[in-house]
Amino acid sequence: MALTRLLIKDFRNIESADLALAAGFNFLVGPNGSGKTSVLEAVYTLGHGRAFRSLQAGRVIRHECAEFVLHGRVDANEREASVGLSKSRQGDTKVRIDGTDGHKVAELAQMLPMQLITPEGFTLLNGGPKFRRAFLDWGCFHNEPGFFTAWSNLKRLLKQRNAALRQVSRYTQIRAWDQEIIPLAERISEWRAAYSDAIAADISATCALFLPEFALSFSFQRGWDKESDYGELLERQFERDRALTYTAVGPHKADFRIRADGTPVEDLLSRGQLKLLMCALRLAQGEFLTRQSGRRCLYLLDDFASELDTGRRRLLAERLKATQAQVFVSAVSAEQVADMVGEKGKMFRVEHGKIEVQPQD
Protein backbone atom coordinates (compact mmCIF):
# COMPACT_ATOMS: atom_id res chain seq x y z
CA MET A 1 0.00 0.00 0.00
CA ALA A 2 1.62 3.23 -1.15
CA LEU A 3 0.85 6.58 -2.71
CA THR A 4 2.78 6.79 -5.96
CA ARG A 5 1.63 10.29 -6.86
CA LEU A 6 0.13 13.20 -4.94
CA LEU A 7 -1.47 16.32 -6.41
CA ILE A 8 -2.21 19.23 -4.09
CA LYS A 9 -4.18 22.34 -5.02
CA ASP A 10 -4.94 25.32 -2.75
CA PHE A 11 -4.22 23.46 0.48
CA ARG A 12 -2.74 25.55 3.32
CA ASN A 13 0.10 27.59 1.77
CA ILE A 14 0.51 25.24 -1.21
CA GLU A 15 -0.96 26.69 -4.41
CA SER A 16 -0.14 23.69 -6.58
CA ALA A 17 2.10 20.63 -6.34
CA ASP A 18 2.46 17.40 -8.28
CA LEU A 19 4.71 14.93 -6.46
CA ALA A 20 6.01 11.58 -7.68
CA LEU A 21 6.56 9.69 -4.44
CA ALA A 22 8.93 6.96 -3.33
CA ALA A 23 7.52 3.66 -2.17
CA GLY A 24 9.86 3.86 0.83
CA PHE A 25 10.87 7.06 2.62
CA ASN A 26 9.77 10.53 1.53
CA PHE A 27 11.62 13.31 3.35
CA LEU A 28 10.22 16.83 3.57
CA VAL A 29 12.96 19.22 4.62
CA GLY A 30 12.76 22.95 5.16
CA PRO A 31 12.62 25.74 7.75
CA ASN A 32 9.72 26.13 10.15
CA GLY A 33 6.66 27.56 8.42
CA SER A 34 7.82 26.47 4.97
CA GLY A 35 4.91 24.12 4.31
CA LYS A 36 6.45 20.72 4.97
CA THR A 37 3.84 19.86 7.60
CA SER A 38 1.18 20.97 5.11
CA VAL A 39 2.34 18.20 2.76
CA LEU A 40 1.99 15.64 5.56
CA GLU A 41 -1.40 17.08 6.36
CA ALA A 42 -2.48 16.81 2.72
CA VAL A 43 -1.62 13.10 2.75
CA TYR A 44 -3.48 12.65 6.03
CA THR A 45 -6.51 14.58 4.77
CA LEU A 46 -6.68 12.46 1.62
CA GLY A 47 -7.12 9.41 3.86
CA HIS A 48 -9.36 10.94 6.53
CA GLY A 49 -11.40 13.73 4.96
CA ARG A 50 -10.08 16.19 7.53
CA ALA A 51 -6.77 17.73 8.55
CA PHE A 52 -4.97 16.84 11.77
CA ARG A 53 -4.27 20.44 12.82
CA SER A 54 -7.76 21.84 12.23
CA LEU A 55 -11.26 20.41 11.92
CA GLN A 56 -12.51 23.49 10.05
CA ALA A 57 -12.21 23.25 6.28
CA GLY A 58 -11.90 27.02 5.90
CA ARG A 59 -8.63 27.03 7.81
CA VAL A 60 -6.86 24.63 5.46
CA ILE A 61 -8.10 26.14 2.19
CA ARG A 62 -5.56 28.56 0.77
CA HIS A 63 -6.31 32.24 1.33
CA GLU A 64 -9.04 33.63 -0.95
CA CYS A 65 -9.64 30.24 -2.63
CA ALA A 66 -13.02 28.51 -2.71
CA GLU A 67 -11.88 24.92 -2.10
CA PHE A 68 -8.92 22.60 -1.83
CA VAL A 69 -8.42 19.59 -4.09
CA LEU A 70 -6.29 16.53 -3.36
CA HIS A 71 -5.67 13.65 -5.73
CA GLY A 72 -3.59 10.52 -5.35
CA ARG A 73 -2.57 7.37 -7.18
CA VAL A 74 -2.53 4.34 -4.93
CA ASP A 75 -0.57 1.14 -5.51
CA ALA A 76 -2.49 -1.48 -3.56
CA ASN A 77 -1.38 -5.09 -3.90
CA GLU A 78 -0.42 -4.76 -7.56
CA ARG A 79 -3.63 -2.88 -8.32
CA GLU A 80 -3.51 0.84 -9.00
CA ALA A 81 -6.39 3.08 -8.01
CA SER A 82 -7.05 6.80 -8.14
CA VAL A 83 -8.51 8.67 -5.18
CA GLY A 84 -9.60 12.27 -4.88
CA LEU A 85 -11.01 14.60 -2.26
CA SER A 86 -12.20 18.18 -2.43
CA LYS A 87 -13.76 20.36 0.24
CA SER A 88 -15.27 23.82 -0.02
CA ARG A 89 -15.39 26.63 2.53
CA GLN A 90 -19.03 25.71 3.12
CA GLY A 91 -17.92 22.22 4.14
CA ASP A 92 -19.17 20.42 1.04
CA THR A 93 -17.06 17.30 0.55
CA LYS A 94 -16.63 15.30 -2.64
CA VAL A 95 -14.89 11.93 -2.74
CA ARG A 96 -13.86 10.29 -6.01
CA ILE A 97 -12.49 6.78 -6.40
CA ASP A 98 -11.40 5.51 -9.81
CA GLY A 99 -13.15 8.43 -11.49
CA THR A 100 -16.58 7.98 -9.91
CA ASP A 101 -18.28 10.33 -7.45
CA GLY A 102 -20.55 9.58 -4.52
CA HIS A 103 -18.09 7.69 -2.35
CA LYS A 104 -17.69 8.05 1.43
CA VAL A 105 -14.66 9.25 3.37
CA ALA A 106 -14.68 5.89 5.20
CA GLU A 107 -13.79 4.23 1.89
CA LEU A 108 -10.68 6.42 1.64
CA ALA A 109 -9.74 5.47 5.19
CA GLN A 110 -10.02 1.78 4.31
CA MET A 111 -7.84 2.23 1.22
CA LEU A 112 -5.20 4.36 2.97
CA PRO A 113 -4.57 3.15 6.52
CA MET A 114 -2.24 5.65 8.19
CA GLN A 115 -0.34 6.10 11.42
CA LEU A 116 0.34 9.69 12.45
CA ILE A 117 3.16 10.72 14.80
CA THR A 118 3.31 14.43 15.63
CA PRO A 119 4.58 16.57 18.53
CA GLU A 120 0.93 16.89 19.56
CA GLY A 121 0.52 13.12 19.60
CA PHE A 122 1.41 12.92 23.29
CA THR A 123 -2.33 13.21 23.90
CA LEU A 124 -2.51 9.48 23.16
CA LEU A 125 -0.71 8.98 26.47
CA ASN A 126 -1.39 12.03 28.62
CA GLY A 127 -4.67 13.27 27.13
CA GLY A 128 -8.19 12.17 27.94
CA PRO A 129 -9.64 8.69 27.31
CA LYS A 130 -11.08 9.75 23.94
CA PHE A 131 -7.60 9.69 22.41
CA ARG A 132 -6.96 6.12 23.56
CA ARG A 133 -10.44 5.07 22.45
CA ALA A 134 -9.52 6.43 19.03
CA PHE A 135 -6.42 4.20 19.07
CA LEU A 136 -8.54 1.10 19.71
CA ASP A 137 -11.22 2.19 17.26
CA TRP A 138 -8.67 2.60 14.46
CA GLY A 139 -7.80 -1.06 14.92
CA CYS A 140 -11.43 -2.17 15.14
CA PHE A 141 -12.31 -0.16 12.03
CA HIS A 142 -9.64 -1.94 10.00
CA ASN A 143 -10.26 -5.40 11.50
CA GLU A 144 -14.05 -5.58 11.96
CA PRO A 145 -16.17 -4.79 8.86
CA GLY A 146 -19.23 -3.93 10.93
CA PHE A 147 -17.51 -1.64 13.42
CA PHE A 148 -17.88 1.67 11.61
CA THR A 149 -21.63 1.31 11.09
CA ALA A 150 -22.22 0.08 14.64
CA TRP A 151 -20.18 2.89 16.21
CA SER A 152 -21.85 5.54 14.02
CA ASN A 153 -25.29 4.25 15.01
CA LEU A 154 -24.36 4.16 18.69
CA LYS A 155 -23.13 7.76 18.64
CA ARG A 156 -26.37 8.86 16.96
CA LEU A 157 -28.51 7.02 19.51
CA LEU A 158 -26.54 8.36 22.47
CA LYS A 159 -26.98 11.90 21.17
CA GLN A 160 -30.73 11.32 20.93
CA ARG A 161 -30.84 9.76 24.41
CA ASN A 162 -28.95 12.70 25.92
CA ALA A 163 -31.38 15.14 24.31
CA ALA A 164 -34.32 13.11 25.65
CA LEU A 165 -32.88 13.15 29.19
CA ARG A 166 -33.58 16.89 29.29
CA GLN A 167 -37.27 16.34 28.60
CA VAL A 168 -38.39 13.11 30.32
CA SER A 169 -39.32 12.37 33.92
CA ARG A 170 -39.56 8.55 33.92
CA TYR A 171 -37.22 5.84 32.70
CA THR A 172 -39.95 4.21 30.63
CA GLN A 173 -39.86 7.28 28.39
CA ILE A 174 -36.33 6.52 27.16
CA ARG A 175 -36.43 2.72 27.29
CA ALA A 176 -36.91 2.57 23.52
CA TRP A 177 -33.49 4.19 22.98
CA ASP A 178 -31.84 1.85 25.46
CA GLN A 179 -33.23 -1.22 23.71
CA GLU A 180 -31.30 -0.15 20.61
CA ILE A 181 -28.23 1.11 22.46
CA ILE A 182 -27.58 -1.97 24.60
CA PRO A 183 -26.78 -4.55 21.86
CA LEU A 184 -24.61 -2.02 20.01
CA ALA A 185 -22.74 -1.10 23.18
CA GLU A 186 -22.07 -4.73 24.05
CA ARG A 187 -20.92 -5.58 20.52
CA ILE A 188 -18.57 -2.59 20.31
CA SER A 189 -17.09 -3.39 23.71
CA GLU A 190 -16.53 -7.00 22.68
CA TRP A 191 -14.72 -5.87 19.53
CA ARG A 192 -12.54 -3.44 21.48
CA ALA A 193 -11.71 -6.02 24.13
CA ALA A 194 -10.85 -8.63 21.50
CA TYR A 195 -8.65 -6.17 19.62
CA SER A 196 -6.80 -5.02 22.74
CA ASP A 197 -6.16 -8.67 23.66
CA ALA A 198 -5.01 -9.54 20.14
CA ILE A 199 -2.58 -6.64 19.80
CA ALA A 200 -1.17 -6.83 23.34
CA ALA A 201 1.72 -9.13 22.40
CA ASP A 202 2.74 -6.88 19.48
CA ILE A 203 2.67 -3.80 21.68
CA SER A 204 4.69 -5.51 24.41
CA ALA A 205 7.33 -6.74 21.96
CA THR A 206 7.73 -3.35 20.26
CA CYS A 207 7.79 -1.47 23.57
CA ALA A 208 10.46 -3.84 24.87
CA LEU A 209 12.70 -2.75 21.97
CA PHE A 210 12.08 0.95 22.53
CA LEU A 211 11.88 1.06 26.35
CA PRO A 212 13.54 -2.08 27.75
CA GLU A 213 14.08 -0.39 31.11
CA PHE A 214 10.36 -0.47 31.95
CA ALA A 215 7.84 -3.24 32.57
CA LEU A 216 4.78 -2.01 30.69
CA SER A 217 1.23 -3.24 31.21
CA PHE A 218 -1.96 -2.52 29.27
CA SER A 219 -5.59 -2.75 30.33
CA PHE A 220 -8.87 -2.16 28.51
CA GLN A 221 -11.67 -0.55 30.51
CA ARG A 222 -14.99 -0.88 28.72
CA GLY A 223 -16.73 2.15 30.24
CA TRP A 224 -18.91 0.46 32.85
CA ASP A 225 -18.40 -2.01 35.67
CA LYS A 226 -17.47 -5.39 34.21
CA GLU A 227 -19.68 -7.19 36.73
CA SER A 228 -22.78 -5.18 35.80
CA ASP A 229 -25.35 -5.82 33.10
CA TYR A 230 -25.33 -2.72 30.90
CA GLY A 231 -29.10 -2.59 30.47
CA GLU A 232 -29.76 -2.85 34.19
CA LEU A 233 -27.10 -0.22 34.86
CA LEU A 234 -28.69 2.26 32.47
CA GLU A 235 -32.01 1.84 34.24
CA ARG A 236 -30.48 2.14 37.74
CA GLN A 237 -28.56 5.27 36.76
CA PHE A 238 -31.47 6.99 35.05
CA GLU A 239 -31.96 9.66 37.73
CA ARG A 240 -28.25 10.44 37.78
CA ASP A 241 -28.13 10.65 33.98
CA ARG A 242 -31.18 12.89 33.99
CA ALA A 243 -29.53 15.25 36.47
CA LEU A 244 -26.33 15.29 34.40
CA THR A 245 -28.29 15.47 31.11
CA TYR A 246 -25.96 12.92 29.53
CA THR A 247 -25.32 9.17 29.64
CA ALA A 248 -22.53 8.65 32.18
CA VAL A 249 -21.57 5.05 31.41
CA GLY A 250 -21.02 3.08 28.24
CA PRO A 251 -18.56 2.47 25.39
CA HIS A 252 -18.21 6.23 24.93
CA LYS A 253 -16.44 6.26 28.31
CA ALA A 254 -14.04 3.37 27.58
CA ASP A 255 -10.28 3.68 28.06
CA PHE A 256 -7.05 1.84 27.29
CA ARG A 257 -4.64 2.43 30.15
CA ILE A 258 -0.87 2.00 29.98
CA ARG A 259 1.35 1.68 33.04
CA ALA A 260 5.11 1.49 33.49
CA ASP A 261 6.26 -0.43 36.56
CA GLY A 262 2.72 -0.07 37.90
CA THR A 263 2.58 3.72 37.45
CA PRO A 264 0.62 5.61 34.76
CA VAL A 265 3.16 6.31 32.02
CA GLU A 266 2.33 10.02 31.92
CA ASP A 267 3.47 10.29 35.57
CA LEU A 268 6.77 8.43 35.15
CA LEU A 269 8.25 8.73 31.66
CA SER A 270 10.19 11.69 30.28
CA ARG A 271 8.97 13.43 27.13
CA GLY A 272 11.56 11.58 25.07
CA GLN A 273 10.44 8.27 26.54
CA LEU A 274 6.78 9.16 25.97
CA LYS A 275 7.53 9.88 22.33
CA LEU A 276 9.26 6.52 21.97
CA LEU A 277 6.26 4.83 23.57
CA MET A 278 3.90 6.68 21.23
CA CYS A 279 5.99 5.55 18.25
CA ALA A 280 6.03 1.99 19.57
CA LEU A 281 2.23 1.95 19.84
CA ARG A 282 1.78 3.28 16.31
CA LEU A 283 4.32 0.87 14.85
CA ALA A 284 2.85 -2.11 16.68
CA GLN A 285 -0.62 -1.24 15.44
CA GLY A 286 0.56 -0.84 11.86
CA GLU A 287 2.53 -4.09 11.90
CA PHE A 288 -0.43 -5.93 13.43
CA LEU A 289 -2.62 -4.73 10.54
CA THR A 290 -0.04 -5.95 8.03
CA ARG A 291 0.11 -9.38 9.60
CA GLN A 292 -3.67 -9.69 9.82
CA SER A 293 -4.62 -8.35 6.40
CA GLY A 294 -1.47 -8.07 4.29
CA ARG A 295 -1.99 -4.30 4.01
CA ARG A 296 0.75 -1.88 4.97
CA CYS A 297 0.16 1.45 6.67
CA LEU A 298 1.48 4.79 5.60
CA TYR A 299 3.50 6.34 8.44
CA LEU A 300 3.49 10.13 8.80
CA LEU A 301 6.10 11.67 11.13
CA ASP A 302 6.05 15.41 11.72
CA ASP A 303 9.08 17.14 13.25
CA PHE A 304 10.94 13.84 13.45
CA ALA A 305 13.85 15.01 15.59
CA SER A 306 11.87 16.67 18.40
CA GLU A 307 12.29 15.04 21.82
CA LEU A 308 14.64 12.34 20.46
CA ASP A 309 18.41 12.12 20.80
CA THR A 310 20.60 10.62 18.07
CA GLY A 311 20.41 7.07 19.42
CA ARG A 312 16.65 7.11 19.70
CA ARG A 313 16.28 8.58 16.22
CA ARG A 314 18.45 5.78 14.86
CA LEU A 315 16.37 3.14 16.64
CA LEU A 316 13.13 4.57 15.27
CA ALA A 317 14.61 4.76 11.77
CA GLU A 318 15.60 1.09 11.89
CA ARG A 319 12.14 0.01 12.99
CA LEU A 320 10.45 2.06 10.29
CA LYS A 321 12.73 0.57 7.64
CA ALA A 322 11.85 -2.91 8.87
CA THR A 323 8.15 -2.32 8.17
CA GLN A 324 8.89 -1.94 4.42
CA ALA A 325 6.06 0.58 4.43
CA GLN A 326 5.79 4.01 2.87
CA VAL A 327 6.95 6.72 5.27
CA PHE A 328 6.64 10.51 5.15
CA VAL A 329 9.02 12.42 7.42
CA SER A 330 9.35 16.15 8.00
CA ALA A 331 12.48 17.72 9.47
CA VAL A 332 14.19 21.10 9.59
CA SER A 333 17.41 19.78 8.03
CA ALA A 334 18.62 16.80 6.02
CA GLU A 335 21.12 15.99 8.77
CA GLN A 336 18.27 15.11 11.13
CA VAL A 337 17.12 12.30 8.84
CA ALA A 338 20.53 11.10 7.66
CA ASP A 339 20.04 7.69 9.31
CA MET A 340 16.88 7.08 7.29
CA VAL A 341 18.10 7.98 3.82
CA GLY A 342 18.48 4.98 1.51
CA GLU A 343 18.15 3.87 -2.08
CA LYS A 344 14.34 3.79 -1.90
CA GLY A 345 14.09 7.25 -0.40
CA LYS A 346 13.29 10.61 -1.92
CA MET A 347 14.16 14.06 -0.56
CA PHE A 348 11.91 17.09 -1.09
CA ARG A 349 12.93 20.65 -0.24
CA VAL A 350 10.01 22.80 0.90
CA GLU A 351 10.12 26.60 1.05
CA HIS A 352 7.23 29.07 1.03
CA GLY A 353 4.84 26.36 -0.14
CA LYS A 354 7.02 25.38 -3.10
CA ILE A 355 8.26 21.78 -3.26
CA GLU A 356 11.29 20.59 -5.20
CA VAL A 357 12.95 17.19 -5.43
CA GLN A 358 16.49 17.25 -4.05
CA PRO A 359 19.25 15.02 -5.46
CA GLN A 360 20.77 12.59 -2.97
CA ASP A 361 24.49 11.95 -2.79
From Swiss-Prot:
The keyword Nucleotide-binding applies. GO terms for cellular component: cytoplasm. SUPFAM superfamilies: P-loop containing nucleoside triphosphate hydrolases. The keyword DNA-binding applies. GO terms for biological process: DNA replication; DNA synthesis involved in DNA repair; double-strand break repair; SOS response. Gene3D superfamilies: P-loop containing nucleotide triphosphate hydrolases, RecF/RecN/SMC, N-terminal domain. Coiled coil: none annotated. InterPro entries: DNA-binding_RecF, DNA-binding_RecF_CS, P-loop_NTPase, RecF/RecN/SMC_N, RecF_2. It is found in: Cytoplasm. ATP binds at residues 30-37. NCBIfam families: recf (TIGR00611). The RecF protein is involved in DNA metabolism; it is required for DNA replication and normal SOS inducibility. RecF binds preferentially to single-stranded, linear DNA. It also seems to bind ATP. Belongs to the RecF family. This is DNA replication and repair protein RecF. The gene is recF.
